[in-house]
């Protein structure tokens, strides 16, 4: 069994297949921004084969291709956008400056942040409507992923509290909803106030 599929052992495959099938139908453009992480590249290889979304890797193409070659990972057909050399850098620098104008971020500071961290570039692509979603956190801290999302995308209108949730699937179907739990919020607001819960 491959490393990517081994984590599915014991999981409710019907639940996962529903998610996969929805992905195959909608063909959303999903960004992954950890080109140095073998696990991310293996996941992309699996995604390319299964067609559950249109993956795009953000980061250094040479680094990604080097890791892929060394580990025997096939990334054929994958679009890789270099956040340091992208033709759209000016667009995203301007967008970041606009999003962070209350902090008086200038173009030089914005460029340093965006070229220094692919997660920020990916979040700006989502904010601009150039992608449907972004996935990170395999090797990037929750803090950095959340910061990029909050700074670049922000919460929905009339929402102040940003939160996270996790799906946990257990082999014991007598627990939760047929063995499936949704946990919120272990990553961002683990001890919410009543107002934060209401938000």
Predicted regions and their residues:
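Anion-binding alpha/beta catalytic cores of soluble intermediary-metabolism enzymes, centered on
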Residues: 7-199
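Serine residues within intrinsically disordered or low-complexity segments
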Residues: 2-6
